[in-house]
C-alpha cells in the first residue's frame, strides 16, 4: 500500500513504463489495467528477464477496471432503454390524444407499436447483458457463489456461458479482456501458492473451506435472531480440520496468509488517485514537486479501516522515521532545506567578497 513511484513523465509509452520498472529487480507480480503503453512496458521487462535468465515477472489484468468498464456499458444500455421507453410513452399519449379528439389514430398507433417494440427489445438486451455480466463477474472472484475455491476450469466454463450474452459493439472491450490470459493470472498464483503452503490436497481443501466459513459468520452488529448455522459452521469445520491434522494450526496460518494476500485489483491506485486529484481545480499544473508532496501525504496518512487501521503505509513498510505526521515531516524538511539554502548563500557571499 506504499506509493513508491510518482514520476511525471513526458509520455506513457512502453519504453517509459519499461524504464520505470527496470530497477525493481525483485518484483514478482504486477497488477495493471489494459493500457497499451503500460502492457507494452511490462512485456518488455518480461522479455528482458527471460533473455537474461532472471526470475519471471507475472502480469495480471486489473479486475477493478474490468468491472468498471462493464458497469459503464450497462449504464449506457440502460440509458438507451430509458430514452426509448420515454419515447414509447410519448407515442402512446399521442394515440390516446388522437382518439379523444376523434381523429384517425392509425398512423400514430403504428408509430407507438414500433416505439414499444424498440423499447422492449432494448430492455431485453439490457436484461441479457446484465445476466451475462453477472455470470462473468462471478468468474472473476476468488470463491464461487457456492463457497468453493475458484479455478481456471470453472472460470473458463462461466466465461463461455457469459460471452454469448455480452453481444454488441459496446461489449467488445470487456469480451477481449475476459478472453485474455492475464485476466486469470491471479488464479494461477493463488493455486500455486496454496499448494506450496499445504501440499496435501484434502487438508488444503479443508483449510480453505474453514477460511471461507470464518468469513461467513454474522457480524457482531447483526440485529435480531440469527437464522441457520452460519454462526457455528466454522466451529464444526474446525473440528473436522483438527481430526485431519492435530497440528494444522501452522498450515492454516499459511493458507490464510495466501488467501488474505491474493491481489486481483489495484484498488489502492484508485485510492491514491483521490489524493492526486485532490484540489485538482486549483492545481492546473501538476508539477513533480507537487506530486512528491502528495506522495508524502499518502504514505503518512493513517488507514481508517480494515486490517491496516491506525497505521500509515510507511509504518506498515517498516520504515523508521522521527515522526509519521505529515506536517511534522514537512516542517523538518523545510528547516533542513532552509539551513542548506542559507549555507549555500553564505558560501556564495564569501566567494564574492574574496
Predicted segments, located by residue:
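C-terminal domain-tail junction helix/linker
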Residues: 203-209, 213, 219, 223-227, ...
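A short alpha->loop->secondary-structure connector
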Residues: 45-59
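Hydrophobic "anchor" residues on beta-strands that sit immediately upstream
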Residues: 29, 58-61
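Short amphipathic alpha-helical "interface-anchor" segments enriched in bulky aromatics
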Residues: 261-287, 291
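RNase H-like nuclease fold core
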Residues: 1-49, 73-143
Amino acid at each position: 500500500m506504499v506509493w513508491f513511484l510518482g514520476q511525471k513523465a513526458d509520455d506513457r509509452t512502453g519504453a517509459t513504463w519499461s524504464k520505470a520498472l527496470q530497477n525493481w529487480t525483485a518484483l514478482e507480480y504486477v497488477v495493471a489495467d489494459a493500457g497499451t503503453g503500460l502492457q507494452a512496458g511490462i512485456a518488455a521487462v518480461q522479455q528482458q528477464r527471460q533473455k537474461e535468465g532472471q526470475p519471471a515477472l507475472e502480469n495480471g489484468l486489473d479486475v477493478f477496471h474490468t468491472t468498471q468498464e462493464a458497469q459503464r456499458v450497462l449504464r449506457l444500455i440502460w440509458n438507451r432503454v430509458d430514452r426509448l421507453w420515454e419515447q414509447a410513452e410519448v407515442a402512446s399519449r399521442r394515440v390516446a390524444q388522437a382518439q379523444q379528439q376523434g381523429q384517425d389514430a392509425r398512423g400514430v398507433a403504428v408509430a407507438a407499436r414500433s416505439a414499444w417494440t424498440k423499447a422492449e427489445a432494448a430492455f431485453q438486451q439490457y436484461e441479457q447483458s446484465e445476466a451475462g455480466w453477472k455470470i462473468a463477474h462471478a468468474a472473476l472472484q476468488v470463491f464461487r457463489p457456492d463457497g468453493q475455491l475458484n479455478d481456471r476450469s470453472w472460470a473458463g466454463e462461466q466465461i463461455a456461458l457469459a460471452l454469448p450474452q455480452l453481444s454488441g459493439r459496446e461489449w467488445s472491450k470487456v469480451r477481449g479482456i475476459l478472453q485474455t490470459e492475464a485476466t486469470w493470472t491471479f488464479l494461477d498464483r493463488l493455486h500455486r501458492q496454496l499448494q506450496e503452503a499445504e501440499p496435501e490436497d484434502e487438508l488444503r481443501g479443508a483449510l480453505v473451506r474453514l477460511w471461507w466459513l470464518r468469513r461467513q459468520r454474522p457480524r457482531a452488529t447483526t440485529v435480531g435472531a440469527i437464522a441457520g448455522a452460519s454462526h457455528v459452521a466454522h466451529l464444526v469445520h474446525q473440528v473436522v480440520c483438527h481430526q485431519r491434522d492435530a497440528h494444522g494450526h501452522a498450515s492454516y496460518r499459511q493458507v490464510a496468509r495466501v488467501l488474505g494476500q491474493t491481489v486481483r485489483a489495484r484498488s489502492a491506485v484508485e485510492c491514491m488517485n483521490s489524493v492526486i486529484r485532490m484540489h485538482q481545480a486549483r492545481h492546473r499544473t501538476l508539477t513533480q514537486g507537487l506530486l512528491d508532496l502528495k506522495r508524502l501525504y499518502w504514505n503518512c496518512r493513517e488507514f481508517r479501516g480494515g486490517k491496516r487501521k491506525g497505521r500509515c503505509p510507511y509504518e506498515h513498510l517498516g520504515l523508521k522515521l522521527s515522526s509519521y505526521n505529515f506536517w511534522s515531516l514537512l516542517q523538518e524538511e523545510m528547516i533542513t532545506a532552509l539551513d542548506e539554502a542559507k549555507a549555500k548563500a553564505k558560501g556564495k557571499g564569501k566567494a564574492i567578497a574574496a
